[in-house]
């Protein structure tokens, strides 16, 4: 039986094939593949093989080192947020390479168990879909305790490309890196993209792909970015699928809100009877720490709603548990948010509901910006059905988001309840 390559296998092969090629760099340091292999070896020497995950917090560089080192010692790796709660280590089933803690934006965080096979399938599919070649450079400013940031290590090392690590997102620091280095790939969440556009940063000619995910991308933001020359690839994925499982490219035709294209690689997509997105394929996790997560037939039923057209293209329409019932009609916050994002004077927006004796769920828009309520209402009257129009507007200095840019829905509901009518 053919063995499944691990992150450590990628590194060993790359150090043999491209020993002097850049492997990883920060804003201050850089390592070739041969140098990075030696650096990882010094960390691996003090790691004992075990079925208990090695739980590590620290800088992005720390997490990158330990990801490779744990792989070389066949030890499950579990990166965690430096500001998060301590997580007890427990023995895992054989074959688990990585444990990623979900964001918890929709409930309690859970540990997602991923195998080398999951991670290899995800890296291979991504590298084919958004071609990643030896000598390319992927700028990674996402947190490495989340799958979106960490998976870039697998993709680049598998391809013989290099990773440019940033310690979090800073628009000016990112602008400097884009000017100084031949960056070909970049991963962002929509809030980061909006900040780049607001500061007037332009994309370099070397940039081929900007992977955008982690939260809904508003059409107005997409249009602004495309007009400014940013080569966007809206994507869909999660910890449970080892990152992106569908990503829009020009081959999928014109983009519209929520469109993420066809499934990558050998993954399959379908919809449950209630409209939830179901996924099956080699990227699907082994399960959650403590059990559960994947049906016996291999299908993962997500908490996301979607539509699949005749060409097999997926459009994500929102979270199933965010659905509001306003005036007897189903209203999804994402639909209203996409509309409001284009309203002049609104820089950021989220929509939720509060209980109401007349409407059932009263639609509440939480807005960052200077658009007055009357202007917002006028904007919505010609663009949204009556049941979906916000009946209450709450102005905020900022919206509650987690480290990956996802809206914290429970915090939004609390803010809406606490706001004065």
What is each residue range found by the language model?
Residues 3, 29, 44-81, 141, ...:
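Conserved AMP-binding/adenylate-forming
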Residues 120-137, 145-185, 199:
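Conserved AMP-binding/adenylation subdomain of ANL enzymes
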Residues 185-188, 196-255, 268:
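Gly/Ser/Thr-rich phosphate-binding loop
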Residues 259-266, 272-298, 319, 331:
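Conserved ATP/PPi-binding loop(s) of AMP-dependent carboxylate-activating enzymes
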